[in-house]
Amino acid sequence: MELKVNIAIDGPSGVGKSTVSKLIAKKLNYTFINSGSIYRTIAYHVIKNDIDINNEKDVISSLDSLEFSLSKNEELFYKGENITLILRSEQISISTPVVSKIPEVREFVTSYIQKMTKGKKGFIIDGRDTTFKVMPHADVKIFLWATAEERAQRRVDQNHQLGYNSNYDEVLYEIKKRDHQDMNREHDPLHKTEDSILIDCTNMKIDEVVNKIISLIK
């Protein structure tokens, strides 16, 4: 039996972190934790409860009443309701960076994941600060990259499959805006750490990326 390790996958919005992580988790029988979905759940929670998303104090206070759970098949439940597909809506995509830039929100998510993984192996965690904040001691660190144009097209295709109609130019604008926010935020800005392996997946198929990462693990 091969010894399991912990894998952290970082990278910008829409690069395919979750898709790749899910496939790797399935192939290696690992547990996948999508940090982005937790941030999206917080955004959903704030909107659902008519909280002003720009009022940091109220957003932070709302964390005390947040009830959610992750299933083994990577579905997310909010107070018993499966909101996995709802979390991919455009409204949630636009609102998530507003809440995720709040330091207390980031600490909440980081603490949640670290408690789940403490003293354990066989986890694959993705996010935009996973390699240096959430899982700084991960055995394998990957930084996925792709051009904004490629990521925008992938997002449009993904939304179409989920039943959402998206305009390419609008999605591209939002992705570039998100990149700027992530790379320039005051706390834990997105960046590649020295010990992370860079994989430019702009012209790679998903299975090629998956196999590349698995080869690095083994």
Swiss-Prot record:
- Is this entry keyworded Metal-binding? no
Q: What class of enzyme is it?
A: transferase
- Please provide one cellular component term from the Gene Ontology annotations of this protein: cytoplasm
Q: Which GO terms describe its biological process?
A: pyrimidine nucleotide metabolic process
Keywords, A to Z?
ATP-binding, Cytoplasm, Kinase, Nucleotide-binding, Transferase
| NCBIfam families per the UniProt record, alphabetical | cmk
Protein name per its UniProtKB record: Cytidylate kinase
Organism ancestry: Bacteria, Bacillati, Mycoplasmatota, Mycoplasmoidales, Metamycoplasmataceae
Gene name of this polypeptide? cmk
